[in-house]
Amino acid sequence: MNAESSSQAQNVDHHEIAKFEAVASRWWDLEGEFKPLHRINPLRLNYILQRAGGIFDKTVLDVGCGGGILAESMAREGAQVTGLDMGAEPLQVARLHALESGVNVAYIQETVESHAQANPQRYDVVTCMEMLEHVPDPASVVRACAHLVKPGGHVFFSTINRNTKAWLMAVVGAEYILKMVPQGTHDHKKFIRPSELIGWVDGTPLREKHMIGLHYNPITDHFKLGRNVDVNYMVHTQHEG
């Protein structure tokens, strides 16, 4: 392994890993710290299903799978799902929950860069949700995802925009006022503008096909998808190699 590939294989922020390991046991508590993920998961899943033309019997990789919320839901749609994460505790929770639920998901503790080196063009669909803002080099993750998907396959990213509105809503509002997620979950400096993400995508065989925002209304306590990408957003890309 050369210096570049070694660096890519260690694209890990151990402080970020520790944050999620500390609360891993409550990953499937529908009223706990991960309640927002449980609530937005149907929106994310439906978006993936619609844009990818369904995932039944397709090979799917969930990068940064955590405790397996999205991975399990995709497996229930008939996909052959692999979940990738660097947190040992979240993966253990994911494996136990899959066993209890009777869902078949292969969970692996490995960086996406390392997985890409061994599995080029292996997957029909790759998802990378709420993960890019938690690693030192998000562009490296985008490149690895592009390497993992088959020509014609689909890659989905979701992250948080970097601007004052996003800081007020995703950090001040969600962490300190509404207490929807633990304080310190997000670092505004690590948020990613859509132009930055698309710039990284354009440096690969992936091409942007669609972008959509994810909105939360604190008055109605309701999540929905919409055109505004000021805060949370998802991007659908396709490998055109």
From Swiss-Prot:
SUPFAM superfamilies: S-adenosyl-L-methionine-dependent methyltransferases
Top EC class for this record: transferase
Database matches in Gene3D superfamilies: Vaccinia Virus protein VP39
EC numbers: 2.1.1.222, 2.1.1.64
Gene Ontology MF annotations: 2-polyprenyl-6-hydroxyphenol methylase activity; 3-demethylubiquinol 3-O-methyltransferase activity; polyprenyldihydroxybenzoate methyltransferase activity
Pathways involved: Cofactor biosynthesis; ubiquinone biosynthesis
List of residues binding S-adenosyl-L-methionine: 44, 64, 85, 129
Source species, domain of life: Bacteria
UniProt keyword annotations, A-Z: Methyltransferase, S-adenosyl-L-methionine, Transferase, Ubiquinone biosynthesis
GO biological process, one term: methylation
Pfam families the record matches: Methyltransf_23
Catalytic activity: a 3-demethylubiquinol + S-adenosyl-L-methionine = a ubiquinol + S-adenosyl-L-homocysteine + H(+); a 3-(all-trans-polyprenyl)benzene-1,2-diol + S-adenosyl-L-methionine = a 2-methoxy-6-(all-trans-polyprenyl)phenol + S-adenosyl-L-homocysteine + H(+)
Family to which this protein belongs: Belongs to the methyltransferase superfamily. UbiG/COQ3 family.
Summary of the function given for this chain in its UniProt record: O-methyltransferase that catalyzes the 2 O-methylation steps in the ubiquinone biosynthetic pathway.
Name used for this protein in its record: Ubiquinone biosynthesis O-methyltransferase
